[in-house]
């Protein structure tokens, strides 16, 4: 595996050991605070023995990628390197810079070493340093590992620039599943059924993708090993609906909607498709389950009250309680990996928007998306700080992303066709 060739054990540089205080003493940025200003960061072009500081050809592409990764997290403003020529000896205070990422690289044969240091301009001291070794063709991956480690220095949580998003696109004329990283690199087609595909869902380890396809005329459930894209297995081909797989936190089971016995209901199945338990029953439609991170509860959608609403079920008692009471319909709930919030889409005043709620307090509902179009199918970033969703309007459906409170809403991918059903997962080493 290529990533295994990178020495991902981060090397703390010698100078850091002496000057960086113990992590317990660190004070991290709260990027969720409404009144927090963006951190201003400069990213000079990478230097190397063969490419002096300020050399645009060798060092600029890596600095540009690092800048893109840092800015993606929503709380960093990267200074345009043209303002200081990409050099690492500018007057940072005059430029209003808070921090500088000083980076360099060195090649030896087919190998490469990348090193980055974080300078606190106000304190005039180095906060941290990281070094990565790998093959030259892995330079982008190493740069993004550096990015995610710098984000961790700011927030206490590793960054997500290497995380991945699955989505459905009709760019080829048929709706198929694609996967790309969060920065829009490496879009690749996963399915080739040449028929409608919906509801892609990553396994917790990020190695498998479950989805539903209509290519046989029935809505069947499939599982693809992303490490070997040609390895696809049918999990459930039961007559009727086999829809919306929701992986358990341990990755051993899924909750799916099956209509084999009449009304669409939630069933617990194993990875081979064997039914372990039926979770709902009755005349109502029950769909779109999402597990709590601790595996003790699920949220799901049911029309048992007459319209689609979000419900919470305790998996031990099987008791279900209604969570949503406003809006014509509420659907597609998804539980934050932190466990504190669920996001869902709600139809109000003729328009779909994304809302969040603390499931322990149904009155805590907040609208987080805004503006034109219908916003649907929310999915959480692996760190629980951002939400991606499908936005329909202006003649097209695309994937957008925002901070969990609705700030920094922007287009995620600008690719051919219409995109829907986003699903976010962590990076895989």
What does each model-identified segment do?
Residues 26-27, 85-149:
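Amphipathic beta-strand/beta-sheet edge segments enriched in Tyr/Trp
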Residues 30-95, 101, 105-107:
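Short beta-strand->alpha-helix linker/helix-N-cap micro-motif
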Residues 122, 181-185, 225-229, 270-274, ...:
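Short loop/turn segments that connect beta-strands within beta-propeller blades
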Residues 158, 169-176, 192-195, 212-221, ...:
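A flexible loop/linker signature enriched in serine peptidases of the S9 family
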Residues 159-161, 204-205, 249-250, 293-294, ...:
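Residue-level detector of Asp-centered blade-edge/turn motifs that repeat once per structural unit
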Residues 165, 206-209, 251-255, 295-299, ...:
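Hydrophobic beta-strand positions that form the internal "hydrophobic ladder"
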Residues 394-429:
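Blade-level signature of beta-propeller repeat domains, shared across WD40, Kelch, NHL, RCC1
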């Amino acid at each position: 595996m290529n990533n295994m060739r990178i020495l991902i054990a981060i090397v703390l540089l010698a100078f850091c050991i002496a000057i960086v205080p113990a992590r317990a003493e660190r004070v991290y940025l709260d990027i969720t605070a409404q009144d927090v200003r963006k951190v201003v960061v400069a990213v000079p072009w990478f230097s190397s023995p063969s490419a002096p500081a300020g050399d645009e050809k060798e060092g600029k592409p890596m600095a540009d990628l690092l800048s893109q990764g840092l800015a993606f997290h929503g709380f960093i403003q990267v200074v345009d390197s043209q303002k200081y020529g990409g050099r690492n000896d500018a007057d940072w205070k005059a430029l209003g810079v808070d921090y500088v990422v000083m980076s360099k690289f060195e090649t030896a044969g087919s190998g490469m070493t990348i090193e980055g240091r974080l300078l606190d301009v106000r304190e005039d001291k180095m906060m941290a340093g990281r070094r990565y070794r790998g093959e030259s063709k892995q330079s982008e991956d190493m740069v993004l590992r550096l990015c995610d480690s710098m984000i961790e220095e700011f927030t206490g949580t590793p960054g997500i620039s290497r995380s991945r998003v699955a989505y459905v696109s009709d760019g080829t004329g048929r709706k198929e599943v694609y996967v790309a990283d969060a920065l829009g690199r490496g879009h690749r087609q996963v399915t080739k059924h040449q028929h409608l595909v919906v509801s892609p869902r990553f396994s917790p380890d990020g190695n498998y993708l479950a989805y539903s396809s209509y290519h046989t005329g029935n809505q069947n459930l499939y599982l693809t090993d992303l490490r070997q894209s040609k390895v696809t297995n049918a999990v459930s081909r039961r007559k009727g609906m086999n829809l919306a797989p929701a992986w358990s936190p341990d990755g051993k089971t899924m909750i799916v909607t099956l209509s084999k016995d009449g009304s669409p209901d939630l069933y617990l199945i194993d990875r081979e498709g064997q039914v372990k338990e039926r979770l709902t029953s009755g005349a109502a439609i029950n769909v779109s389950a999402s597990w709590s991170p601790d595996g003790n509860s699920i949220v799901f959608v049911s029309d048992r009250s007459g319209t689609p609403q979000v419900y919470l079920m305790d998996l031990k008692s099987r008791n279900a309680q209604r969570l949503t009471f406003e809006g014509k319909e509420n659907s597609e709930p998804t539980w934050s990996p932190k466990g504190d919030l669920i996001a869902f889409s709600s139809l109000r005043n003729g328009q779909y928007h994304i809302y969040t709620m603390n499931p322990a307090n149904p009155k805590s509902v907040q609208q987080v998306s805004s503006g034109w179009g219908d916003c649907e199918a929310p999915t959480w970033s692996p760190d629980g700080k951002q939400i991606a969703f499908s936005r329909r309007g202006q003649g097209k459906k695309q994937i957008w992303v925002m901070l969990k409170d609705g700030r920094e809403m922007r287009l995620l991918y600008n690719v051919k066709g219409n995109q829907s059903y986003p699903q976010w997962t962590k990076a895989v080493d």
